[in-house]
């Protein structure tokens, strides 16, 4: 077995005198005994670390909610508005189509499962009007420009909701 021989640490002089061990409880030299405390001890380091951590957390929360939060909210509002205002004019509910006995519904078909429910969604025309293009442009610029784009988003929403549009 190999032992690592390291030099023993030398005893340091303590600036605060420590009473001798032979004294009883309550007996002493008259001065209180305090442990050595450095100016950058664990308490100051922990306090500084906590303050810096809280500051960084506050800056991160402020950055997230001041930029990304409103931008994502505007994007959600623009999508919902566009969907509500430009849904198909026909049926909004899916139509049901039942299969006849001779038709197969596909994988997973078992005995007695001859009827299946197929959903057909309404078709939307592929043409984009000038109003739709302006709405998408103004509402798309809003989140990109963050706080400066808020008036553009509101202008796009007002233009879309205006009766003459």
UniProtKB/Swiss-Prot annotation:
Signal peptide: none annotated. It comes from the Eukaryota. It holds the Pfam family DUF5562. The chain crosses the membrane at residues 135-155. Keywords: Membrane, Transmembrane, Transmembrane helix. Its main location: membrane. It is a single-pass membrane protein. One of its GO terms (cellular component) is membrane. The keyword Signal does not apply. It is found in: Membrane. Residues 1-36 are annotated as: Disordered. This is Uncharacterized protein C20orf141.
